[in-house]
């Protein structure tokens, strides 16, 4: 799928070096089709890394996509320059009158805080409310998933005895569900979190589509098929967990070595990426079956989910 992003976005050169089709703005303007409008609400400190990971996965389909990047306005990121944020990112006030075919809400490194103590919680809740009427389908990732389950359904998060960090085996619970089409009987997903949700707490119109014995529910979807909650990080690069581990070591946090990740459990050994194909499948299936096939041609007709 050609993704239409600003010509000078750093992710563009990275993706082009990987032979991923990135369409420049001028060429996109001359395409006689309606592209999918996708909003990425990026809450991660490493903006460029997260943008690149998600854009890489959105590129695996034949439909053109226009991307908007959204940042918080009530909290200013300390890890990304203001010039960068102002150049490439929009605030909620700038996009709140717009409709989107799909939206992705990332994780955030704030999971040990009570939700209401997060500096941008009020703004985050306003955007969650807005997403119900202005995004046809929304995918929530890690903290974004836990926080949305809490806000929309009142489902609490539960602290873990120690951080879940590593690559874990998962099983699909509904093999023929369109979101999991093409998934193997066992697939692998990275996790990196201190909190979880209990399957017994999931209620209402929520359905668990995939789970892990070690990490619990991993892919959850609403019965209306417009909200997806992924508790892990299929978007992660090969070295993301290694970089997190080394970062925490340098901070003196005594992190556990990510499970099932480094060969022979040796942090100096190069890890293998075991989740690449299923990451592509999940994002491609979501885009095809729950965005492209379902969203109205006239975006103004998108209503409450």
From Swiss-Prot:
GO terms for cellular component: cytoplasm. The keyword Amino-acid biosynthesis applies. It is found in: Cytoplasm. Keywords: Acyltransferase, Amino-acid biosynthesis, Cytoplasm, Methionine biosynthesis, Transferase. InterPro entries: Class_I_gatase-like, HST_MetA, MetA_family. Gene3D superfamilies: 3.40.50.880. It catalyses: L-homoserine + acetyl-CoA = O-acetyl-L-homoserine + CoA. The record marks 192 as: Important for substrate specificity. Its EC number is 2.3.1.31. Substrate binds at residues 163, 192, 247. GO terms for biological process: methionine biosynthetic process. The record marks 111 as: Important for acyl-CoA specificity. The keyword Chloroplast does not apply. Belongs to the MetA family. Transfers an acetyl group from acetyl-CoA to L-homoserine, forming acetyl-L-homoserine. This is Homoserine O-acetyltransferase. It comes from Methanomassiliicoccus intestinalis (strain Issoire-Mx1).
